[in-house]
A protein has these predicted regions:
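A short glycine/serine-rich beta->alpha loop
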Residues: 58-59, 86-97
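Feature 926 captures the class I aminoacyl-tRNA synthetase adenylation module centered on the KMSKS loop
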Residues: 1-64, 68, 112-151, 155, ...
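Cytochrome P450 heme-binding Cys-pocket and its upstream "meander" loop
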Residues: 75-82
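Short glycine/proline-rich turn/loop motifs
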Residues: 82-88, 170
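Non-catalytic, structured segments within soluble enzyme domains
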Residues: 160-164
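Adenylate-forming
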Residues: 69-73
Length: 417
């Protein structure tokens, strides 16, 4: 199979083919197939006969036409307006095994035809290997088809597995990674439902304060960290490093769920006119909006579902998040203020130790803490004081005692059952 060479050859009176003098088709006749078409001045019954002609039996290799894929896709010669708008293209995604063939031949043809590169960037992927990290082939019988995986784990989970593979490296089919992706998708659903539940008034109407209502240090710290994620994830996507973008976003998301949501959930349930409540709600809404958009390229279905609960239109038509979406004054560099960030760091650290104590004692996470004693430096104790109310509420702390000391420590005295 392939594109036939549009060439015929004369057959002399003795039946010998004269390869020295090819018969070429006029340009306005192209394309032609010499195995069925007849050269000018001959008839079909002269094929293979003395004094007649024969067609060239060879075909071009696959790269002869594959090397023109940017031009073919762009409507070259057929749609000049489209071609002017899309060529040169932005990106050629391809695997590493055809760099010297497809990539090289495409660049050469573009240079010869247009004097230009066919695209500005090339993203090199690896192969998808079987679960034993062997190259898949029909002869080996180790081909893994995607449909059963999509049906079992869902499209978002399969996309998560694919997006976890580093550019330029081979990636094995890994159902364990797909299960991780499914858990992430379910967590997005549940965490979003939890967060949006804190934004609803008594009749269920969502009330979202503006971002300038964010005043609590712990809320500002969370949004400050998110601003950094926005900058890093955006830079990764612009460099086609989707795995890095996912890694940074996912890491923040799990910390957001495990620490921040637990710390602010009580405050977010307060009266709407309370500044602390407004701060928590504005921060929750802002963070959720940004996180959904950051995750949308990898988890398109679950993010679209959550977006439809409280936003108009498709998330995939929404603007990509910027640091401005994380609050006023975030700045393009998205630098985190150390003093503000220490509030969230200290609160999360102390809450984690409280949880550990309850787990060790085999007590419910709702079990009250009679006395929580924290020993640390003045700066870290000041950071804890800025989030004291949230730590008390999240940990069920009755009494919080702080002590200055060079040797940090947390003592948890649980209330009697």
């Amino acid at each position: 199979f392939g594109v036939p060479l549009p060439v015929w050859y004369r057959v002399d009176a003795d039946g010998e083919v004269d390869f020295a003098v090819p018969l070429l088709a006029d340009e306005d006749r192209l394309p032609v197939d010499p195995s069925t078409d007849v050269p000018e001045g001959y008839s079909a019954d002269q094929r293979g006969e003395p004094g007649g002609f024969v067609g060239d039996p060879d075909v071009m290799d696959t790269w002869a036409t594959s090397s023109l894929t940017p031009q073919i896709a762009g409507g070259w010669e057929d749609d000049p307006d489209l071609f002017a708008r899309v060529f040169p293209m932005d990106l050629r995604p391809q695997a590493h095994d055809i760099i010297r063939t497809w990539l090289f031949s495409t660049v050469v043809r573009s240079e010869l035809e247009h004097g230009a590169l066919p695209w500005s960037d090339v993203a090199i992927s690896g192969w998808v290997l079987d679960p034993d990290r062997k190259k898949m082939s029909k002869s080996k019988g180790n081909v893994v088809t995607p449909l059963p995986l999509l049906e079992q784990h869902g499209a978002d989970a399969v996309r998560y597995w694919a997006a976890s593979g580093r550019p330029g490296t081979d990636t094995a089919v890994d159902e364990g990674q797909m299960k991780v992706g499914r858990r992430l998708a379910m967590k997005v659903l549940n965490a979003s439902r939890f967060a949006l539940g804190r934004l609803a008034d008594e009749d269920g109407t969502l009330v979202v304060p503006p971002l300038d209502a964010v005043t609590a240090p712990i809320d500002r710290a969370m949004l400050g960290r998110l601003a950094v994620v926005v900058v890093e994830a955006t830079a990764a996507f612009e460099a086609y490093d989707y795995a890095r973008a996912l890694e940074r976003t996912e890491s923040f998301f799990w910390a957001f769920c495990d620490d921040y949501l637990e710390l602010v959930k009580t405050r977010a349930y307060g009266e709407a006119d309370d500044p602390g409540t407004a701060s928590a709600r504005a921060a929750l809404a802002g963070a959720l909006s940004v996180l959904l958009r950051l995750l949308a390229p990898v988890l398109p279905f679950v993010t679209e579902e959550v977006w439809s609960w409280w936003q108009v239109g498709s998330i995939h038509a929404a603007a990509w998040p910027t640091v401005d979406d994380t609050g006023p004054g975030a700045g393009s560099d998205a630098a985190v203020d150390p003093a503000t960030d220490a509030v969230l760091e200290m609160a999360a650290e102390v809450l984690g130790l409280v949880r550990r104590a309850k787990t060790t004692a085999k007590r419910s996470m709702r079990a009250p803490v009679a006395v929580l004693t924290v020993t640390d430096t003045a700066a870290r104790l000041a950071a804890l004081a800025a989030a004291e109310g949230d730590v008390r509420d999240a940990g069920g702390v009755v009494e919080l005692v702080t002590r200055m000391g060079d040797e940090a420590g947390v003592e948890v005295e649980l209330a009697e059952e």
